[in-house]
Amino acid sequence: MATKARVMYDFAAEPGNNELTVNEGEIITITNPDVGGGWLEGRNIKGERGLVPTDYVEILPSDGKDQFSCGNSVADQAFLDSLSASTAQASSSAASNNHQVGSGNDPWSAWSASKSGNWESSEGWGAQPEGAGAQRNTNTPNNWDTAFGHPQAYQGPATGDDDDWDEDWDGPKSSSYFKDSESADAGGAQRGNSRASSSSMKIPLNKFPGFAKPGTEQYLLAKQLAKPKEKIPIIVGDYGPMWVYPTSTFDCVVADPRKGSKMYGLKSYIEYQLTPTNTNRSVNHRYKHFDWLYERLLVKFGSAIPIPSLPDKQVTGRFEEEFIKMRMERLQAWMTRMCRHPVISESEVFQQFLNFRDEKEWKTGKRKAERDELAGVMIFSTMEPEAPDLDLVEIEQKCEAVGKFTKAMDDGVKELLTVGQEHWKRCTGPLPKEYQKIGKALQSLATVFSSSGYQGETDLNDAITEAGKTYEEIASLVAEQPKKDLHFLMECNHEYKGFLGCFPDIIGTHKGAIEKVKESDKLVATSKITLQDKQNMVKRVSIMSYALQAEMNHFHSNRIYDYNSVIRLYLEQQVQFYETIAEKLRQALSRFPVM
């Protein structure tokens, strides 16, 4: 009898990931409980099949009755975890932000149905972005042989972090940036990743905001901005506003993953060696350190720069060789992205992450980063464009143009991911089997011919046999080929999917600031602000616009380089693949003489 399971939490599938949308209380049939990576395959009453997080369902008894059981739930431990105090706090936070959950996993839902009018109109941008916030982890076992295709499909939910913080790591966030703010505005979307509450119950990630972002008025209406020590200049180049790039660039090599343990072996983890190419001096970091860096970058720069989430960690089977290889590959890609960004790579927190000399220096730098006041919208106070102020109409047009392009690109990237996933499944499943069937059929025919006893057909029978073996070889080539070309195309698209998922929140911050400026006339009329305050607001929104344009120019230059490189590689490998097949077929053909 097929195993049944009751869905414990709502789960919204992402396009292109072979996932199945399920709702709390729904009964599904488990068709494959051993997918791996914290996933199982299920079928709903409509006959639709797809992946569902293991911890989102409860296995029902064999009689099919839905009764409470402490012994058969896949998520028993998750249920017990929910009783912890940390979960109680997270649940309280989730309840207070419940209005932001309804938009699901599509960060562009508010863009498609945007409101107009008052200041709250852009609140819909609070949908969880896939890249910097609600995007589920991008990392799972690199199980190439699975029927579900490319490993990016297994974007499992964040699991309980058994790689707990050491005692030397601060508990509560010390930065004032994490304090609740009643002035959270359109830019106050909860961009934080589930890692902020990774020790709590494994429920839908978008129920836990990572932080509460102060409203843009903190920046726009500040009477006098302090002169920060750090400056982020913006210049006007051939293609418009741009960040100032350092004279020498560097990359960071992530290598040598090693398994470590603590507490007499009760806790285990993977540690990576990071070597910046500009110093060639290595430092070691565990995954939780990467997680800390991601959070600090998101908090500090997330209002202006897209910070894609890390490949998430996994608990079950996380030390499998293929999984470690895949996660290291994606950590490498993430670090390379950060190194290539002229603002991120030069930031104090990033440099400290790569160049600390000892434990004391690491702890000091860590605490300093967590107390950084120039975070969120206040990052714009450090930016100095070398250009005249823009008028509000132009600012709004630039913002709309960025929103439209990133939304359209997000759709295009998801479509390519979906098509690529389907193609991967065909290449690793049905297609090789068809070639194998042809090969076996030809060899069977040759065996039948050989049984005739006729002396003059030996050459023909041998040729048919070799042709059959050729098709079996082609089957193997077809099954292996996606790892040589499609994999890299999928990974590139997956990276950009993460980037694009950050933009609704960034655009929301800018749209909110624009709305504030539009309201300034009323505030001046009612003597709530002065005319000078209004002029300061316009100037500061202009700075925000220059920052957005500079970031988009950086984004476009990287996009052109990346897609040119990855599609060129894909086509080169495809040409080589078909040439190899053609050569094998020519060799098989040469055994058949013209008669």
Swiss-Prot record:
Phosphothreonine, modified sites: T216
Top-rank taxon, per record: Eukaryota
Effect in UniProt of substituting K363E: Strongly reduced membrane binding
Tissue: Widely expressed, with highest levels in heart and placenta, and lowest levels in thymus and peripheral blood leukocytes.
SH3 domain boundaries: 1-62
Post-translational modification remark: Ubiquitinated by ITCH.
Localisation: Cytoplasmic vesicle membrane; Cell membrane; Cytoplasmic vesicle, Clathrin-coated vesicle; Golgi apparatus, trans-Golgi network
GO biological process, one term: intracellular protein transport
Biased composition (Polar residues): 111-121, 135-145, 191-201
Family in the record: Belongs to the sorting nexin family.
Domain remark text: The PX domain mediates interaction with membranes enriched in phosphatidylinositol phosphate. Has high affinity for phosphatidylinositol 4,5-bisphosphate, but can also bind to membranes enriched in other phosphatidylinositol phosphates.
Protein name: Sorting nexin-9
Source organism of this protein record: Homo sapiens
Gene, per the UniProt record: SNX9
